[in-house]
Structures are given as structure tokens and as C-alpha cells.
Amino acid sequence: MAEPALLDPTAAFDLRLYPAHLFDHELPLAGGGGGDDDDDLPLDGLEFDLPGDFSVEDFLLRSPERDDSGEGSAAGSGPTASPSSSPTTSASNSAVANGSGGEVKHEESDEGRSGGGDPKWSLKRKQASPGPSSDAAKCRRSGDGDVSPSASASRTAVDSDEGGTVCEEEEDERRAARLMRNRESAQLSRQRKKRYVEELEEKVKSMHSVINDLNSRISFVVAENATLRQQLSGGSVNCPPPGVYPPAPIPGMHFPWMPGYAMRPPGSHVPLVPIPRLKPQQPVPSSKVVKKPESKKTVENKSKSKTKTKKVASVSLLGLLLIMLVFGAFIPGFNHNFGMCGQSDNAMFRNFGQSHARVLSVSSQDKSSLNNSDMIGVDVGKMTGNTDGPGKKHQPAHNSSEILPALLYVPRNGKHVKINGNLIIHSVLASEKAVAHKASKDDSDQSARDHKETSVAIARYLSLPGKDVNRQETSSADGPLPQWFREGMEGPILNSGMCSEVFQFDISTASSNPGGIIPASPVVNSSSVNATEKIPAHSAAYHGKLKNRRVMYNEAIPLTGKTANNTEPFNRTSESSSKLPDSKPASSVVVSVLADPREAGNGDGDPRVSPKPLSKIFVVVLVDGVRYVTYSCTLPFKSSSPHLVN
């Protein structure tokens, strides 16, 4: 440890021992104690030649070489020291060289060397390293004892030139060593940083591998969880029922379907411990638990059976509806719409508007008998005759042809309407009978053909003679009325009387030969003598009234050209008809029923279904196999209640 040096503030200041840049140029420098101008040092001869890399730290660590002699020790202790010795002592003690890392502390002491009480300054050196270099030792004092300021100052003045050169070389070497140390430390720091970065990269790689491993484990566990859930939901027998085994295994325990290394940390050698399978403690709950999958199966089977039953029921219902539709359209049942009890319906046909419609024969009347009452009706299984006539009695017509009820379905009011063709035939037959009576009255066939506007008689039972009719065998007048138009068993009902003749034409006489169209055998013996005896007289008022065509009349509409008592035309007709031979019976056959194309549509769709209701139909009738007559029949409008003809 360097000894502290005392600095006399009253001593003269020597600028040669201190760098000039530390002091202001305008600072006045006083002499020893007198302060005279003579004591001032000349500064003109001094030259301050400093290097470019000069530093204060290097300057503080550098000091001139001092002598270790003990001269002037006593003189330096006194207060009367020479002015030249004070700055020398301060300069020698101001800086102590101790390597490159030392620190310098300035301490102010209140103690005085003499009893004068003047302040004393000292520089204390604190060394960082105990081993000084050999070159630095040359710049320090060689002695260990106290050196007086005057002696050190004199010694420094002698060897100042040699010490300056040695210190410069020493400073250069020290600077080079410091640079080398700095470079080595920088290199070591870079290497440490590089190693640290490499370690961090290795850690990042290891973390990435751990993350990938954990992701693979998570995916494996998720897949196994999904498989177990599927087995539990499907009621698999392989999975144990809940409640029998422990609720959950220990986290360290491995599953049997997973590999051993998948759940163990790397480097461990723990053997795999199998899952213990315990026997059920409670047999009763276990039996109940075992039955759960069976109950699930039964529930699933029941649900499947229910769905199958519903499907079968729906399919069977559709099939039944289809069968009903087929049978209802092509295989009709017995006709009970007209209240016919004794009638034998051996064959029934429906006309759907085809061009090749069936021809139905209608029994004609035998005109040879004059005393039999004529009855136009639907029931042809029985005949009503005059019991007063010789050889006449009520008997069924075994040789007569059976009337086949032609059931016609016409679209009207959004649905199909059933029309009985036999009643149309009887209506046309009544019209033809009136025309025949008119023709026999005029004795001219040409006049009968030219008479186009004839009324249509209502097809119903005519009045029978009260004295000649056996009322027990005839049908009651209050019985069901013949109807040829009905909409679904309800709605408006139309009887005959709404038909009018449109035109007629004859065919060749060859068609009337036995090889042609065969007329039906007579069914009812025609007689008009007593047919109209009980027609009310007030029916003639029909000519004076104009009624709505929708209104049905409760009496027969009288034909055109009748007399006041309404019996002359029938009497004349019966007389003339009695002269006709029996070999040519009269017959009428419905050939076809047509609809107005303007109302039925364009015919692109189904001919049986039309969205428009029909108001008129055309009926083509073959009369006696030689003449075709076309009638226009008006259909009634739909109403809430049926209209009946009384």
C-alpha cells in the first residue's frame, strides 16, 4: 500500500509536473508565501506535447520515478519548506502506479505537520491487484520509508527526462495488453452467447418433439374414447357393464389396448400392470345391469317392428285403395239406386266415351192387341195385361231380351256423374211413340220425318185403367221413381223429359235384313186405347204457361197436336197400329252418348275426367235398325236438395 503524501498549499506550483490542459490559461499562479510577481514561473518556454489518445485515467496511474533516499526527511517535515520541494512532493505523491485497474482516493485531513493548523492534502492509493509489473516498479519510489517532499522534488528534477521516455514505452505496452485482454474477453463472450443460442435451439427441438408426441397420444386417446363410446351406445357385450368394476383406473395404469411405451416417460423401466378384474359383489344389481343391454335390444326391436308395421299398413292401405278403385271402375256391383227388387241384373256395362260403345237392345211393344194397357217402366220382369181379354194373363216375358242398364259416367261439377242409359232409352222410346202416333194420324211417313219438334214424354208409369188393372200385381204409384241422373247418391236428380230431337237420318234397307242388326223381341204389348183415360184435363194448361226447365212437373207433358180430351191421338194410333203386322216390331237402341266438345275440353287429358261441368249431352238412338236419331239432353244444375218428379 503506498504511503500518503502531504501537499503544502503554500508551496510554489510547478506546471512542469502537471498537465497544462487541467488548468485554465487565465489562472494566475502565485509564488511561495509572499505573492510577489518575482516568484512567478515563466510559462513561455513550456511546450505541452500530448498524444492523441491521452486519457485522464492513464495519467493518474502514471507518476515520475523518485529516489528512495532519505534526504531531506527532516527538512520536509518542517513548515519552512522550500517552494520547489512542495510541488515536487505533491507531484510525486499525487499519482501512484499500480497496474491498470487501481483507484485513487483524495482524502482531506484536519491534522497539521506543525502546530500551525494549516490543512494538509494527501492522495491515497487503493490497489486492486497485489502484483505490480516490473516496468511499473521503475516509476515508483524504491524505498519503504517516508520521503520528504524536498528530496523527492530534487530527485525528480534530475531524472525527469529519463522517466518520461520509460513511462511512454510502459504505457504503450500496457495499452497493447489491455487491447488483447479486451479482444479475448469479447471473443469469449461471443462464444458463450453462441453456446447459449445452440442450447436454446436444442431445447426448442426437444419441446417440439414432446409436443408432437403429446399430440399423437391425444389423438390415440380420442380415437379409443370414440371406440368405447360406440361400443357402449351399441350395447356391446365385450365392454363391462357400468357399476360392476371400479369406476376409473389409476392415471399411472395403462390401458391394455395401448402400447407400454406410449404412456411412460422416456427412460423408465416400469413394467405394465394389468387391470384387475374383480368379481361382482352384488349379484342382484349385476343381473339388473346385465339386462340393460337386452332391454335396449328389445326397445330397438320394438321400434323397428313398429316402423315395419307402419310401412306394411301403409302399403296394404294403398293396395286396398287401388283394388277398390279398380273394382269400382271396371267391375261394378248391383244397381240399387232405382229400387228394383225383382229385376235380374245379369250383365252391366259402363260407357266411358269410347267410340266402340255397346249397343243395348230395348224391348218393343206388340201393337196387335188393343185391349191391353201400355205401361212404360223400368221393371221388365213383369207385365201388366188386361185380364178381361181372352187368353191374356200376367206372366213374365221369358222370350224377351233383357235390358242391360248402360251406366254412363259423365264429368260434372268436379266429379263423375252416373247416368242410367235405360231410362234415356225409355225416354227416347216415348218420344218415338209420340212421333209414330203423329205419323199414323197423318198417314204419311214423310210428314212424320219432317216433324222434328216433338215433346218428350216423362219416362214413368202411366195411368192405368181402374177397372181393368189388377192393383195387387202392378207396381205402386208411390214406389221409387226411375232416375237416370244422380250425382253421388245425392244432389239434383233428373228424370226424362229434358231431351229434344236434333236430327235424324235413315240407313239402307239392307241393314234391316235378318243378317243385319237384329231387333229385340217384343216385351210389352203396346196399346193406347185406355192409356190416357185418366190423364187430368188441367194438363192442357201446359200450353199457356212457360216454366223453368229446371222445374219438374208432377204430370206427364202432353204431346203436340192433342185434342181436348187427350185421347184422340192415342185412339187413332192404336187403330192404325192394330193393322200393322207383328213381323216388324219397333225397337230403339242407344248407340252412343256424346258430350259437347266445347265443354268437355280439347281431349288432351283423360277423356273420363274433365274439370268443366257438362250442361248438355247428345244421345244417338237407333230406331228399328233403320234410322238414327240424335237427341240433345240438358243436364240440371247442382242444387242442395234433389228434385224429384211426382
UniProtKB/Swiss-Prot annotation:
Q: Where is the composition biased (Polar residues)?
A: 562-585
Cite the ranges annotated as topological domain Cytoplasmic. 1-311
Q: Where is the composition biased (Basic and acidic residues)?
A: 59-69, 103-113, 291-303
Segments of skewed composition (Acidic residues):
159-172
Q: Which UniProt keywords apply?
A: DNA-binding, Endoplasmic reticulum, Glycoprotein, Membrane, Nucleus, Transcription, Transcription regulation, Transmembrane, Transmembrane helix, Unfolded protein response
- State the compartments where it is located: Endoplasmic reticulum membrane; Nucleus
Where the record annotates domain bZIP, the positions are 172-232
GO (cellular component) term, any one: endoplasmic reticulum membrane
GO BP term, pick one:
response to endoplasmic reticulum stress
Which GO molecular function entries does the Swiss-Prot or TrEMBL record give?
A: DNA binding; DNA-binding transcription factor activity
Tell me, using the record's free text, what induces this protein: Induced by dithiothreitol- and tunicamycin-induced endoplasmic reticulum (ER) stress response.
Q: Which residues are glycosylated?
A: 371, 399, 525, 530, 565, 571
Q: Entry's Pfam families?
A: bZIP_1
Sequence ranges of Low complexity compositional bias: 43-53, 71-98, 279-288
Tissue specificity is: Highly expressed in leaf blade, and at lower levels in roots, leaf sheaths, flowers and seeds.
- Tell me, in one coarse class, where this protein mainly resides: endoplasmic reticulum
Record-stated family: Belongs to the bZIP family.
Its name, as the record gives it, is: bZIP transcription factor 39
Q: What gene is this protein translated from?
A: BZIP39
